[in-house]
Regions:
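Histidine/acidic-residue-rich, glycine-tolerant segments that coordinate divalent metal ions
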Residues: 1-103, 192
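Metal-dependent amide/peptide-bond hydrolase catalytic core
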Residues: 66-257
Length: 257
């Protein structure tokens, strides 16, 4: 548990790029789970290296790792119930350093994301990932070591606090405040946020602020190599933080400013 038992409420903003929204629009979510959990995984596939001209004398970990990557994608379609949210992504794949050498080791890194508050979906994915990786590796005479780390829980938004936030942002911004469920249909997003740890300790609301869309030349979303943010919205984000704090303290502690 975080040492924040003295905190009564928490609020955060995340910038959002590449969306066709007016710059500075504040998106306020509904209550419940709004963002997925996230966990890192690392798979190390070990074979036997050697010269590229003599593959018969080697055990190629690249081939095994490539088949593992493909096999893992079947977890979503063949093992999760329809409607269960689970995303398994390999974002990094490394093996070898020379074009004429079969390496000893191939490695994969990635993430697992679910919106299951009890993380049973995540447990299933972890179990099957380990079994699949080790089984496929063995089929290619390799071994596979699978490890998991850095679990971050789902973001949980407090519904009464979200309703407060919508009222406060409307007071401050008028039509610049938007109910995020109009875009999401009330479904959780697949992104993750470590502020979620706070949301499991105290009532929390996590909001987004539009930081540029196609009209501003910000055509790409988060983590795209060409992503751009319109930093003219920074003052608005600061004002929103301040206004939320002032209004919440007035409503809940009778503190007037």
């Amino acid at each position: 548990a975080l040492p924040i038992s003295h905190v009564d409420a928490a609020v955060m903003f995340h910038v959002l790029a590449g969306m066709p929204l007016p710059v500075g629009t504040v998106l306020v979510p509904g209550g419940g789970i709004t963002m997925a959990s996230c966990e890192q995984y690392h798979i190390v596939v070990k074979g036997k290296g050697g010269h590229g001209s003599t593959p018969e004398n080697c055990i190629d970990p690249i081939t095994a790792a490539a088949h593992i990557h493909i096999a893992l994608q079947e977890i979503n379609s063949r093992e999760l119930k329809p409607g269960d949210f689970g995303v398994l992504t390999t974002g990094r794949f490394e093996a070898g350093a020379a074009s004429n050498v079969i390496p000893d080791v191939a490695q994969m890194w990635g993430t697992i994301r679910t919106t299951d508050p009890e993380n049973k979906t995540g447990e299933l994915i972890r179990t099957r990932m380990t079994e699949i990786a080790q089984g496929v590796a063995a089929a290619f005479r390799c071994t596979a070591e699978v490890s998991f780390a850095d679990y971050c829980p789902c973001m949980v938004v407090d519904k009464p606090l979200a309703e407060n936030a919508m009222d406060y942002m409307t007071e401050l911004l008028g039509k610049g405040a938007m109910d995020m469920t109009a875009l999401t249909g009330g479904k959780p997003g697949g992104g993750s946020e470590d502020f979620a740890f706070v949301s499991h300790e105290v009532p929390t609301v996590s909001m987004f602020i539009a930081a540029g869309g196609p009209e501003q030349g910000c055509c790409y979303g988060q983590h795209h190599p060409k992503v751009r943010f319109d930093d003219s919205i920074l003052y608005e984000g600061s004002a929103a933080f301040g206004w939320f704090a002032l209004r919440w303290l007035y409503d809940n502690a009778g503190i007037a400013f």
